[in-house]
Amino acid sequence: MVPVASAPAVPPAEVIAAFCRKWRIVEFSLFGSILRGDFNLGSDVDILVDLAPDAPWSLYEWTEMIEELRELFGRDVDLVEKSGLRNPFRRHEILNNREILYAA
């Protein structure tokens, strides 16, 4: 369990849903230290997204998404695209220990 004093405020579900609709995200999950007991004031928020197949985002838009998420969570974020999880061990660990906040 993450101590309340060090846990970031997770935006309300409707804010996450609006963000996902805007960026054509079909699934939005948290993973990593935010869900474990080792989250601290210096931790970033690990976010896994699954984009719609026709989402045309370039590196520029990806950077915009990260900046918007930093504002929403009030701290640094590590944004990972589900299709980019190529290492089978890391993929297994993330997919089995995530918390889905939005699914279209």
Give names to the regions the model predicted.
Residues 30:
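Conserved histidines in hydrophobic membrane contexts and catalytic metal-binding motifs
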Residues 48-50:
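Short hydrophobic/aromatic beta-strand micro-patches
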Residues 1-27, 36-37, 41, 52-104:
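Catalytic core of pol beta-like nucleotidyltransferases
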Residues 33:
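N-terminal beta1-alpha1 ligand-phosphate binding loop
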